[in-house]
């Protein structure tokens, strides 16, 4: 059983990593191609492309220029420890044991606009390139066309080696769109997290993102390899809600945010 999550815009390259172990991204040559096509953009063009401030445009244009191979622990950091958004706040990977990290390396994948598909210990350098960015490139009009079926094929190769050919989708719609789900050679289950507000269960973005990270950590720390085990997830007050769930969308609800 594999599970996938989204990356984060917020990064932490200052805190020392909790492990010396690392691997290299599997799609590094494709990332290099994207970098080569992004480097000619000036800060204003980067700001307009990503709909970000002038200050962030300057920062990210410089990141494209600074990006260089080879990746080492001196100029890069393990992906699961470098990302620091809401999902990763929920995950708290900096508290993982060495055994947790080793297990996650085999079961967790992070979708990325620049790196394609990352394992937790794959080294990355600082970047910002969301999957939904409308960046016309040598392969098409956006990043979905750039990646094509490559990420799906890699996931299929890994699903073929898993004890159960099941993919748990904990990614956002933006990133899941880079996976051609109908061509996956395994079952897909998408957990959804809803909080009770004004008498109704609703998806509240901040809480849902954090919950996806908590479920990822729970899968890893429980060494979960069977779908049914997901229904026992109960972090932060969430519970599996069979009445609201379907065969492929498993809904977890809670009465009050914790």
Swiss-Prot record:
It comes from the Bacteria. Disulfide bonds: none annotated. InterPro entries: YaaA (IPR005583). GO terms for cellular component: cytosol. GO terms for biological process: response to hydroperoxide. Belongs to the UPF0246 family. This is UPF0246 protein CJA_0191.
């Amino acid at each position: 059983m594999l599970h996938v999550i989204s990356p984060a815009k917020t990064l932490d390259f200052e805190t020392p990593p909790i492990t010396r172990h690392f691997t290299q991204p599997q799609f590094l040559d494709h990332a290099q191609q994207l970098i080569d096509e992004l480097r000619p953009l000036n800060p204003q063009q980067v700001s307009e492309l990503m709909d970000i401030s002038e200050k962030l445009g300057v920062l990210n244009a410089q990141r494209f220029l600074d990006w260089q191979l080879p990746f080492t622990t001196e100029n890069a950091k393990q992906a699961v420890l470098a990302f620091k958004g809401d999902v990763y706040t929920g995950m708290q990977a900096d508290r993982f044991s060495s055994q947790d990290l080793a297990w996650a390396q085999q079961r967790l994948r992070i979708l990325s606009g620049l790196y394609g598909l990352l394992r937790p210990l794959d080294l990355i350098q600082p970047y910002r390139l969301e999957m939904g960015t409308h960046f016309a490139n040598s392969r098409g009009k956006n990043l979905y066309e750039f990646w094509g079926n490559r990420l799906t094929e890699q996931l299929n190769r890994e699903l073929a080696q898993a004890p159960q050919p099941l993919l748990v989708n904990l990614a956002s719609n933006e990133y899941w769109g880079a996976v051609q789900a109908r061509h996956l050679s395994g079952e897909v289950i998408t957990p959804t997290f809803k909080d009770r507000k004004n008498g109704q269960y609703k998806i509240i973005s901040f809480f849902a993102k954090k919950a996806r990270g908590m479920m990822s950590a729970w899968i890893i720390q429980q060494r979960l390899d069977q779908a049914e085990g997901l229904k026992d997830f109960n972090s932060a007050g969430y519970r599996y809600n069979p009445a609201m769930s379907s065969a492929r969308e498993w809904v977890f609800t809670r009465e009050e945010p914790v």
